[in-house]
Amino acid sequence: VATVDCSDYPKPACTVEYMPLCGSDNKTYDNKCNFCNAVVDSNGTLTLSHFGKC
């Protein structure tokens, strides 16, 4: 199972680096920062489906 450590999030701003991750909501996030901010917003219900685009 793929996991991402989001313990140091949320961050107020994310970089524009492109390293896509696919969330359990079937949405592609541009990078870990965007994904982790979404995880925090979802109260932990969002998880990583896999690395790369959905």
Curated annotation (Swiss-Prot):
Disulfide bonds join 6-36, 14-33, 22-54. Gene3D superfamilies: 3.30.60.30. The keyword Secreted applies. InterPro entries: Bifunctional_prot_inhibitor, Kazal_dom, Kazal_dom_sf, Prot_inh_Kazal-m. The record marks 16-17 as: Reactive bond 3. It comes from the Eukaryota. It holds the Pfam family Kazal_1. Glycans are attached at residue 43. GO terms for cellular component: extracellular region. Keywords: Disulfide bond, Glycoprotein, Protease inhibitor, Repeat, Secreted, Serine protease inhibitor. Residues 4-54 form the Kazal-like domain. It is found in: Secreted. One of its GO terms (molecular function) is serine-type endopeptidase inhibitor activity. The keyword GTP-binding does not apply. Avian ovomucoid consists of three homologous, tandem Kazal family inhibitory domains. This is Ovomucoid. It comes from Anser anser anser.
